[in-house]
Amino acid sequence: MTTVAISRCDNYELEKVSTAVKKCLSLIGNIETIVRPGMKVLLKLNLLSASLGPERAVNTHPVVIRALVDIFKGDYGCEVYIGDSCGSLRTGSTDKAFRVTQIDKIAEDTGAIIVNFDKDDALDITNNNAVILKNFKIAKTVKSVDIVVNVPKLKTHGLTRYTGAIKNMFGSIPANGKKNVH
């Protein structure tokens, strides 16, 4: 089941973002029955650009990721992974995006594990009931964790008009595979 929660936050100060994120988790309800110590949690962020920092509002803001890492590691005792495949099709873009957005520093400071989906093993997914896309690949980590927390960046998009939670999951498709399913 998919549950969505939204909370207003007027800036990216860590304390305010953490409060807003905790409010979202409380809106989901009974989070303690879903998340247990030792679970593997993937924060599926949105890294569209390897050249634009947090101030450009293109990628998931690093403070949001920091707040989530602190909550899932600190409050729930989970093993936290941070993963994506950058929107750019250039080799090395995802690693660069983790650096430019300072996600690599967050992982280093907190012990979270960065997963570059372009370098992750890929799993073949088949859905014979699908009308159009019956087969595609996703990063293995997406299926191997206990919980995937989708952390999109709501913004406009040239092909789909806007991008959000559903579109963000396209980043689970490694490397050039994304262009085939757009």
Outline where the language-model segments fall.
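N-terminal and secondary-structure boundary signal
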Residues: M1-H182
